Amino acid sequence: MSRVKGGTVTHARHKKVIKAAKGYYGRRKNTFKVARQAVDKANQYATRDRKNRKRNFRALWIQRINAAVRSHDEALTYSRFINGLNLAGIEVDRKVLADLAVHEPEAFGAIVRQAQDALAA
């Protein structure tokens, strides 16, 4: 049985890792062993932060909605506004509400009035 040398496969694998480490500082960009560790850690951060991004954007939307609601009515809080939306049967998610609050304040004001009417009733 002849000897099987894995040089091309190993070279391709190393090249893939070095390519992923492009732009890194020091030995992390051109030494396979160090680059592999750096790329693995970067992938861990990327996985974690894909989860955190959802959390961060939801918090941002809530802050924007709260600020816009308070600019329309000082006494109305975010939680009471959301309660008013539920009572009024308005099913709009926070992403759309935040976008309306920033780009179309008049339309958002109409939604705030509907929520207030539902709370008063």
UniProtKB/Swiss-Prot annotation:
Ribosomal protein: is it a keyword of this entry?
Answer: yes
- PROSITE patterns, sorted: RIBOSOMAL_L20
Swiss-Prot/TrEMBL keywords: Ribonucleoprotein, Ribosomal protein, RNA-binding, rRNA-binding
GO terms of molecular function: rRNA binding; structural constituent of ribosome
A biological process from GO: translation
Record CDD domains: Ribosomal_L20
Q: Does the keyword DNA damage apply?
A: no
One cellular component term from this protein's GO annotations in UniProt: ribosome
What NCBIfam families does this protein map onto?
A: rplT_bact
Q: Which family does it belong to?
A: Belongs to the bacterial ribosomal protein bL20 family.
Q: Could you tell me what this protein does?
A: Binds directly to 23S ribosomal RNA and is necessary for the in vitro assembly process of the 50S ribosomal subunit. It is not involved in the protein synthesizing functions of that subunit.
Name assigned to this protein: Large ribosomal subunit protein bL20
